[in-house]
Amino acid sequence: MIRTKISAENLNLFYGDFHALKDINISMGERQVTALIGPSGCGKSTFLRCLNRMNDIIPTCRVQGKLMFEDSEIYHPDTDVVALRKRVGMVFQAPNPFPKSVYENVAYAPKLHGLKDKARLDEIVETSLRQAALWDEVKDRLHKPALGLSGGQQQRLCIARALAIQPEVLLMDEPTSALDPISTLKIEELIRELKQYYTIVIVTHNMQQAARISDKTAFFLVGDLVEFDDTEVIFTNPKDQRTEDYITGRFG
């Protein structure tokens, strides 16, 4: 029995008068990869940003309904957003390393949370870089600028940076869209490895990628969650005609 990690019940989100998410109901399992697919503007990235309240930075944004992280309500007035984001990490579309050394990029968040012990920081940096399949490539250049890494290495560094505070959930917003095919393959292999330890939610425009790496797939269209099922079902026997039309390239 797979334990539910994140669930939404009649979740609605508005940007001013614009209804961006409409009555979303979904349950995402622990240590599974859930892919969010759909055409541009369908609400998939908006939904992803709800999961660690990144939408809070938009003044006109308001949320109705229930969004749960295990037994805690994500949008409850008493929710500690900093603590939430420690448990729910995020990797963005374009690699965005800080203009610091490789080491300082990974050590940044643990230091921010008050960790000062050098030996412990060293351990976290190495462990995180190993988990991100980057350690062997950067172990001899830890104190050199992160911006000197290739695009694929920078994105894996950003994953290591997110892992450094030991989150339970990792959100990925099109993490390979700016990368070449070889770097994309490495990130996909990494995602398959990481799901042993983390719950992963990924937004992707790449149908083949969703089919390759995810356990569950959610198809969004103009703010509606049209269909959510095992990835194999979504791609081979979808229940909704709109899902089939999108997957087969009839629109999108």
UniProtKB/Swiss-Prot annotation:
SMART domains: AAA. One of its GO terms (biological process) is phosphate ion transmembrane transport. Keywords: ATP-binding, Cell membrane, Membrane, Nucleotide-binding, Phosphate transport, Translocase, Transport. It is a peripheral membrane protein. It catalyses: phosphate(out) + ATP + H2O = ADP + 2 phosphate(in) + H(+). It comes from the Bacteria. It is an enzyme of class 7 (translocase). Gene3D superfamilies: P-loop containing nucleotide triphosphate hydrolases. Residues 6-247 form the ABC transporter domain. Its EC number is 7.3.2.1. GO terms for molecular function: ATP binding; ATP hydrolysis activity; ATPase-coupled phosphate ion transmembrane transporter activity. The keyword Transmembrane helix does not apply. GO terms for cellular component: plasma membrane. ATP binds at G38, P39, S40, G41, C42, G43, K44, S45. It is found in: Cell membrane. SUPFAM superfamilies: P-loop containing nucleoside triphosphate hydrolases. Pfam families: ABC_tran. InterPro entries: AAA+_ATPase, ABC_transporter-like_ATP-bd, ABC_transporter-like_CS, P-loop_NTPase, PstB-like. Belongs to the ABC transporter superfamily. Phosphate importer (TC 3.A.1.7) family. The complex is composed of two ATP-binding proteins (PstB), two transmembrane proteins (PstC and PstA) and a solute-binding protein (PstS). Part of the ABC transporter complex PstSACB involved in phosphate import. Responsible for energy coupling to the transport system. This is Phosphate import ATP-binding protein PstB.
